Amino acid sequence: MRLYSFFICFLLTATTLLSCKNDVKNDTSEGAETAVDTTVVRSVKESKEEQKAIANSVLAKLMTTDETRTFTRYIISASLTDVISKGKGPYTIIAPSNEAFSKLSKATLDSLVGQSGNKTLQTVLKGHIVIGDFSSSSILQSVKNGEYTVPTMGGTSLTFFMEGSDLLVKDASGAVAKLGKTDILSANGQVHVIDAVLGNF
């Protein structure tokens, strides 16, 4: 009888220990699955947020603005899309119109987009990307008492000034353009369209 009681006690103890061990394994497995699920959810959420940011970026605005299709094509050729679509900015793009590019000679265009022209193209395009968020109204306010200079991504600067009722912009080389369509707003900046390509090339 004592032997039987001892055996029963031993069996119950062993069963309890085994059950506890399995519970620990299950908890560990469930914990791992939860961690994986959390990581996946976070990745999906980050991916969606990134896609939303790109869809509302200055690059998206350039792509959907008829006047800046050529400028956008060159931005893509120069591998600057990630900079202005994923960068927090803000960026103010002073974008030459399609017509502005059509005024350039074939030789000039070939030098910009030729096989060895990417570096030159990047330099020219970065000279049209201003660091900061500048609306046309804020620029007009700033030029009331004279010229207003802002830095570009290319390490150069652009200077805004008035001539009669026109708002103009010039670069260090002396090239001048007139602002036309302005304040095309995006999540990480805005776009102003100009009637000439700036830069010394």
Summary of predicted features, one role per range:
Residues 2-9, 20-201:
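Mature, structured domains of secreted/extracytosolic soluble proteins
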